[in-house]
Each structure stands twice: as structure tokens, then as C-alpha cells.
Amino acid sequence: MAEVNVRNFNINFGPQHPAAHGVLRMVLELDGEVVERVDPHIGLLHRGTEKLMETKTYLQAVPYLDRLDYVAPMNQEHAFVLAIEKLLGVEVPKRGQLIRVLFSEIGRILNHLLNVTTQAMDVGALTPPLWGFEQRERLMIFYERACGARLHANYFRPGGVHQDLPESLIEDIGHFIDPFLISLSRLDALVTPNRIFKQRNVDIGVISIDEAWVRGFSGVMIRGAGVPWDLRKSQPYECYDEMEFDIPVGKNSDCYDRYLIRMEEMRQSARIMRQCVDRLLGSEKNGPVSSLNRKVVPPKRSEMKSSMEALIHHFKLYTEGFHTPPGEVYVAVEAPKGEFGVYLISDGTNKPYRVKLRAPGFAHLQAMDFLTRGHMLADATAILGSIDIVFGEVDR
């Protein structure tokens, strides 16, 4: 019988594909239906964020952070304002810290709800996204009530937060937690034991601990490999060291483990939210939400009506902005997708000399070739869904 040479063929996945989670183009080299090589092409959403931030004052640069991982915008702001505060040596009052932690955890739930439900949709389940978006809508309303915006918040500011929360909002967030946990249990019962969901995710996209470290994994991706690495515990910032919560870790390092970790992290986030709400309504009911250093934080309207000095401070802060001492600083936070870092170099002026943003999704996407090789074409969407990428932060 004559020998037949079968040549591998290339296909384009995206950038219009709904499972590409944004404007990702992947060139897949296939042997039949088995993936031999994956070549991700990025840059289709590049907007030059880092360079734009270097042309703005520190206060004007904050909104750019919302447009990176736009699924959980406040978590990105958090890293940037912490970096500025580290340069300035500014302390945030306890009530301000609690509000920041509360909204960071709301952001984590917003992110994980979207991810686990769209991951289920990527493998054929159409009900979970409808349930997930119902809960996300409630959380988005909390965002809106806190700062007036559903998505691009611009709420975290150097020195604290833009404004205090009304007591009714804090109470409503507290009332949200128990119904949310019931809804999460329903989602868990629907998806987790599902035979088809398991077949599509178990033993797919496996990576060892050593490979995960080498590739710069963080967040859910490294915890899925069995490493209890969470910056909220290992390098606590704000008041996370005062919070009680557990770090879920996986043992098989596959897509299914990563899904399970995200489900458990939502429960832990709800636990942290409850602690924040209790303290904001109890021991920390009153007090400032921002630093009282008027060289960094603008004065209140009431002060400006009676004090010329306050009016001058306000004018200077919104025109020229504050100056930071020369130096460099790196601050990382445990964002929902992994370690989001901001490397800031100051030359003593009112603008950053250099801003480098460390996006976790960028490192995770690079491993797409390693994770997918040898799997079927259909598994590529499951793996892509489990690594949780958003192109706002990958392309910056």
C-alpha cells in the first residue's frame, strides 16, 4: 500500500470568535483534530496605556487603570494608589481601608462569576451565564451607588477613597451576602457534578508546579497547581491581615480544579465582605475615609466655603497635582486574575517618569501553547476559558 503523507494545516481562531474572550487571534497548527502548536497573536487592543499615564498627573492617571481588566476595575486602581501612597508615605484611615477591601472583594466576585459561567457556556451550558449575570447586576448597582459609575469607577484615590459610603448601602451589601451564597450553591449543584462539564474539563490543560513558576503564573493558575500563594496572606496589604479567610488550592492543576478554586474563592470573598460590613457598621462606623493630608487629598466642599487655604489646595491639586519624592516602587495586589503589579518611577515631578503595569493575564496567555499541545481542538476553548484573560490588561 502506498505511503500517504498527511500535512498539518493551520487555522485561525478569532479575533471574532465568541470564545476568544476579546480580540485574541490564535493560529493553531492541527494534525487532524489534535493541536500541535498554538501561536497567540496579541496587540489588537493596544492603546499605549503606560505611555499615556506618563503624560498625566497622578490623579488624572487613575481612570486608565479601570480600562485594563474592566471586569473588576477597582482591583487595578488599588495597586496604583498603593504605589503612590508608598512613594508619599501616606497612611490610609482604617475606614478607608475597609471600604477598599470590601470593593476589591466585590470585584473578585464580579470576575469569578463571569469566568465560571462563561467557561460553562464555552463547553455548551447556556443556563449558568443567565444566573451569573443576575448576581453581577446586583453588585454593579453597589458600584454605581458608591461612585456613580457601573464600570469605570475612579473610586480609589491616593490617600483613601473618593467619598464615604452611605449607611444604607453598607446594610444592603450585608443583606446581599446570604442570598448570593444560596444562588452560588444552586450554580454549584448545576455545574460541578455535571458529567459533560467534567468530561470537558478534567485532565485538560494540566501544568506542573515547576512549569507554573517558570512561566510566571500567579493567582488561581498557581493555586490550581497546588501552591497556596495568595498575596493577601503572603504579603498582606491594607487590612487583609485582620481578615479571616482560607486559600483554596487544587491538586490536579487542570481546568476543573481552576473552576473549583474560583467557586470557593467567591465564598471566601463573601466571608471577607461580611467582616468588612460588620466593622463598617460597628467599630469603624465613624471616621475619615481618606488621609487628612491636604497636600495629597482634596478638601471637602464645606471646608472650601469657609477657608481660602482649602480653596487654594483644591485648585492646585486639580490643576498641577501633587509632587512625589524621587524614587521607585513596586506594589502588587492579588487581583482576581493573579498578581497585578505596578512599577512606578518618580523623578520628583507631578507626573510619573515611568509606569510599568504587570498584567497577570499576559503571563498566563503565553503558556497557551504549552497547555494546549496534544489536546483536541475543542479543548482549546476550555483551556482559554480556564486561564481567564481579558484583553484590556493583556494588550494595555
UniProtKB/Swiss-Prot annotation:
Catalytic reaction equation(s): a quinone + NADH + 5 H(+)(in) = a quinol + NAD(+) + 4 H(+)(out)
Main location: membrane
Annotated gene: nuoD
Subunit description: NDH-1 is composed of 14 different subunits. Subunits NuoB, C, D, E, F, and G constitute the peripheral sector of the complex.
Pfam families recorded: Complex1_49kDa
EC number: 7.1.1.-
Organism from which the protein derives: Bartonella quintana (strain Toulouse) (Rochalimaea quintana)
Family of this protein: Belongs to the complex I 49 kDa subunit family.
Enzyme superclass (EC): translocase
GO CC term (a single one): plasma membrane
Membrane topology: Peripheral membrane protein
Subcellular location field: Cell inner membrane
Membrane spanning stretches: none
Biological role stated in the UniProt entry: NDH-1 shuttles electrons from NADH, via FMN and iron-sulfur (Fe-S) centers, to quinones in the respiratory chain. The immediate electron acceptor for the enzyme in this species is believed to be ubiquinone. Couples the redox reaction to proton translocation (for every two electrons transferred, four hydrogen ions are translocated across the cytoplasmic membrane), and thus conserves the redox energy in a proton gradient.
SUPFAM superfamilies in the cross-refs: HydB/Nqo4-like
GO molecular function per UniProt: NAD binding; NADH:ubiquinone reductase (non-electrogenic) activity; quinone binding
Superkingdom of source: Bacteria
Name of protein: NADH-quinone oxidoreductase subunit D
InterPro entries: NADH_Q_OxRdtase_suD, NADH_UbQ_OxRdtase_49kDa_CS, NDH1_su_D/H, NiFe-Hase_large
Keywords: Cell inner membrane, Cell membrane, Membrane, NAD, Quinone, Translocase, Transport, Ubiquinone
